[in-house]
Amino acid sequence: MIRLIKILFLFYCLATVSFFQPFDLVSAQAAKAISYSLLMGLLVATCLSSVSKRKSNERFRTPMVWLMILFGVACFIPTLCNFDQSVLQSFSVTLPFFSYALYFTMHRFSFNEDFIHKIIFALAICTIITHIINLITFPVIIFGTPQDEYDLSRGGIRLVMIGFSFVVLSFFITIDKWLRTKAPKWGIFAMACYIAIFLSYTRQHILICTFLGFLMLFNHVHWYKKVIILGLGCILVMSIFPKIPAVQNMIELTQEQNERNRGNETEDIRIQAAKFYGYEQFPSLANRLFGNGVFTFKSAWGRQMQAVTESERVYAVDVGIFGFNWSFGIFSIVCLLVVFYKAIVVRSQKYVVGRYYFIWLFVSSFASGALLYPSQIIVTVIVLYLIDTYNYKRLYLCGLKSA
């Protein structure tokens, strides 16, 4: 049974990245149908499992349970508010968010750390390889769809990187492994992940990952090495990075956007989106607390919202945490903040990788859709489980030593 659950979990992870869509053989709709079926199967298996006792190492249990309840409430909001969208339609489009419940699946069937790391590394490697192939074959898109957006204004080809969050997580894990073991393979893997992050040409991710990567190195070495790392970092930032053509283009693009925003009466597009999803579009206090629900383009309300967002050019994926707030309300945001707090701030949380990942997730969620994509949700769930596993193992070993 456990072996079958692990296979289903692996295939679900692949489905969240649409199986990398080679030559568009697996359409987005087919991948979505497969992922929905796998997710439902995993959740049903979790509910039917004979193991019902609460485990002591589920530190995120309470906020995750409340998130599931609030997601369920959100399925009824559009119908109760007469938004012209049925409960069934709302459930079908909200279902990917229930993948947060896979946190309980992983605990229920006690996934081992090696299995999880293999999934993370395999998908990160596949992401890097497929992205490089797409860059080489551009404008022909081999992995993905021809409709995927691209941008040539940043000194390189900015393409959609399927499975990006697996690369980010692998970046932090491999740095941690290299610091602990000094094995060259982990250092090489970390560099490959960083290069892939840079090739995404997404400014906030490059800046955040660069800063956090240096911080990981800085916090794990002696003081004299800290001075060396700090010096090298200053040299890179002040002298080398600005001379890289892609970096120059991204700096110039940022300056142009700032000048354009100052010259125009209209605000920055992300500030407009943050206002739209943060506090402007809530018909009542109940909607502010519980959200508006998730809309689907198959409903009249969804088509109306699509027209509004297109005309005003405000997109939830540009301001993920505000988009999450719009769909699920303040109570859900509070649950998320509790998760962030337990993963980042609480001193008993000793899993360094988890802390750095959640710092990246929290900061990037203000300017990307990091909380909204299924492929990023599943990575977040994996990290939550790894935090629990690492800290429980650490407490167990401490107990053995003191006995």
PLM features per residue range, with description:
Residues N264-F328:
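Long extracytoplasmic/lumenal interhelical loops at the membrane interface
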Residues M1-Q255, E310-K401:
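Hydrophobic transmembrane helix bundles of membrane-integrated enzymes that assemble
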Residues A28-A31, S239-F276, N287, S299:
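Flexible juxtamembrane loops connecting transmembrane helices in multi-pass membrane enzymes
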